[in-house]
Amino acid sequence: MDWSHLWLYVSPPILGGIIGYFTNDIAIKMLFRPYRAIYIGGRRVPFTPGLIPRNQERLAKNISDTIMGSLLTPDELQKLARRLLKTERVQGAILWLLQLAIDQIKTDTNKKSAKIVAGILRDLIGESLPRLLKVLARREDFLEAQINQIFDQILLELQLSEEQASRLADWFLEVVLPPDVIRQAIVDFLTDRTIQIIDESFREKTSGTYWVVANLFGLRNTLTRLRTFCLDEKEATNNRLTELIQDLQMRDRFRKILQNLTLQNLPIGTVRQLRKTTRETVRQYIQTSGSDLLQGLTDSINWENIAELLLNRLSNSPVVMSSLEVVSQELALILERYLEKDLEVIVAQVIPILSIDQVIVDRVKSTSPADLEAAIEGIVKNELQAIVSLGGILGLIVGLFQTAFFIFSQQ
């Protein structure tokens, strides 16, 4: 072997290793370069642009099909959804939303929440509730227990105190039956016809001494003079009636009557019948006039103020704040039971909506060839460095085989 030609034996392994090591980078660049088509004399130069830029749309479709066919399958998406929608995560999300809603209510300067709640209350009380009550009132047992309880615990036990009875007696004697009203009632009662009937009845039905007085004197003149006195002497009549009321202690008599007035003094049978009548009266009233009552009540109430007060109270209530976690947990459990049954159907419906394959295609198509080249080179350099090294080793081995073949061929 002529050692003067040593470079003939050494150069094949060295060149093979160098070529094998840099082949990947060269191949990647050849796939992408040039990025755009080159035209000479109006004709496109062959192999321009590079293979990937020229077929980028088809590459995007193939990448999308590969990912959706082997990586993001419906089963994998279901597993991903189950991991994402674990009960703890769902509960945390619901709790966050509830707290966010309460914070939004507190800072609602336009009172949008109050207007919404006001509309709900107005519809509930003014529209829905009257229709519901009208239907329920047809039942014989409608509000039976509630009305009986109110009757037994309130109406049956209702009794005026001494102060209340005194005030009511004063009002009765000063407003309902003052002396002037009594005087006018006497005048209206003592008509000529009434006086004649009283006089004749007194003459016919009396006996003994009263018969003598009735037939000799009669009551006609006396009653006529009384009526005339009430008409001519109004002030004097009122004074006499006031004195009579005081002498007869009518105020104290009325007070005692009112103070002792209670349903407990009535017979048991009467109380039971009164309770039944009360229940039927309430039921009949709700059937006939309940809708109008609630409608009038709805029109007279400022629902926005009520809704605002209600929301302020609820947003600052410690009970509401402490119950948010419980509510979120219950809602999360309900959602979990629903997903266990219908998750497969939901995922099947969500996949077309998300259009993941089209997103991948659009993303690959919108990426410039230079960015694709840089991404692939980064992957090769960081994750596939062994392939680069293996290319150099294979090039070295091929070069060694060439050297060995060259040596054996000379011998």
Curated annotation (Swiss-Prot):
Domain of life: Bacteria
Record key words, sorted: Cell inner membrane, Cell membrane, Membrane, Transmembrane, Transmembrane helix
Record's keyword annotation contains Heme: no
GO cellular component terms attached to this protein's record: plasma membrane
Main location: membrane
Pfam families documented for this protein: DUF445
Membrane-topology descriptor: Multi-pass membrane protein
Signal peptide (from-to): none
Subcellular location: Cell inner membrane
Keyword Ribonucleoprotein: no
Transmembrane segments: 3-23, 387-407
Family assignment from sequence similarity: Belongs to the UPF0754 family.
Protein name per its UniProtKB record: UPF0754 membrane protein Ava_1421
Organism per entry: Trichormus variabilis (strain ATCC 29413 / PCC 7937)
